[in-house]
């Protein structure tokens, strides 16, 4: 099956490939100066030369940190049309037609009791959360669902931008 010539060709290809990699490594280290930089003490990591301390945004302890505009102000100027675009992220699991998907339907969610859709199988932590889905409660939940309701089945990571949350809530308010 294998004759001497086939084995010789395979060995030559392997050795040639290794030689090529060795030469390319040697050429690259010559061009890009890979290795010690000659700066600092023996064994010092090069990356340490670029580290610097970062002070907290609040300055001294006890100072209030400006977190931007409050939610009520942003909600007052929210754009439901922009919220409809943000709702595209929700469509994979939620519907607005009154039928449940992977998640409960969101038709009439603003003002509804938390875990209040009859017949939907909510997680125990969501059932225990209680309260109503006010715009403020939705805003907090949509920031980071897993932090607000630990153990929720909702896999969504959250909406980091306050404007996106306000626009989405304004859109959902119109879907009553």
Curated annotation (Swiss-Prot):
Binds 1 heme c group covalently per subunit. It comes from Paracoccus denitrificans. SUPFAM superfamilies: Cytochrome c. The lineage of its organism: Bacteria, Pseudomonadati, Pseudomonadota, Alphaproteobacteria, Rhodobacterales. It is a single-pass membrane protein. One of its GO terms (molecular function) is electron transfer activity. Keywords: Cell membrane, Electron transport, Heme, Iron, Membrane, Metal-binding, Transmembrane, Transmembrane helix, Transport. Pfam families: Cytochrom_C. This is Cytochrome c-552.
